[in-house]
């Protein structure tokens, strides 16, 4: 029997195979799991740079920014400081993507392939955002982690808190992209 909400699972939860890329992109957050995965991929030789991004976050007030928090995790996991690019102003996923692209351009890093490391329930919105902001010829690979919420594609529908989180992502996708759909940059 098919569960009627499998289509939501398919929409929200994205994970692809990972191949070598030019950079590992890490949209900011206040949990260590995404930087731990990025460091793991870095050490396995998947990309020469990690670009964590994010500005101030009251949940990690010990740090000036999500970037500083994530950078410290990376360094503690053996990632060389010069392999960690800096973007410490972003306040949301669109700014994570837009300001990341600016950092890459400023550093003259030509991006053809990128690995996006993010929370599992944030993966569709994060991927769509980076795809809209970055040039269309950039190929994205998505590697997800389970954060402290424990929400995954296999359990999001089992309790109200997890369901609310996933449904919130659907609402955010609608808000983020309603104006992008009719006026996207076109691939020729």
Task: State each model region's role.
Residues 1-157:
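A structural signal for short, hydrophobic/glycine-enriched beta-strand patches
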Residues 66, 87, 161, 169, ...:
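Acidic-residue sensor for enzyme active/binding pockets
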Residues 73, 157-173:
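A polyampholytic, Gly/Pro-enriched intrinsically disordered region
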Residues 154-162, 182-188:
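Short, highly charged low-complexity linear segments
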Residues 167-188:
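A conserved mid-domain beta-alpha-beta active-site/ligand-binding segment of alpha/beta enzyme cores
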């Amino acid at each position: 029997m098919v569960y009627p909400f499998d289509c939501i699972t398919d929409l929200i939860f994205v994970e692809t195979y990972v191949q070598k890329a030019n950079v590992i992109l890490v949209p900011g957050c206040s949990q260590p799991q995404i930087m731990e995965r990025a460091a793991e991929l870095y050490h396995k030789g998947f990309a020469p740079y990690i670009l964590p991004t994010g500005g101030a976050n009251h949940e990690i007030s010990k740090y000036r920014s999500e970037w500083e928090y994530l950078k410290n995790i990376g360094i503690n996991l053996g990632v060389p400081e010069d392999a960690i690019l800096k973007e410490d102003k972003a306040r949301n996923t669109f700014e994570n993507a837009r300001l990341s692209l600016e950092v890459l351009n400023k550093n003259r890093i030509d991006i053809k392939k990128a690995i996006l490391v993010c929370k599992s329930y944030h993966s569709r919105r994060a991927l769509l955002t980076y795809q809209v902001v970055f040039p269309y010829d950039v190929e994205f690979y998505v590697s997800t982690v389970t954060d402290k919420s424990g929400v995954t594609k296999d359990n999001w529908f089992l309790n109200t808190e997890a369901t609310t989180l996933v449904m919130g992502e659907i609402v955010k996708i609608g808000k983020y992209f309603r104006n992008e759909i009719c006026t996207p940059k076109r691939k020729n």
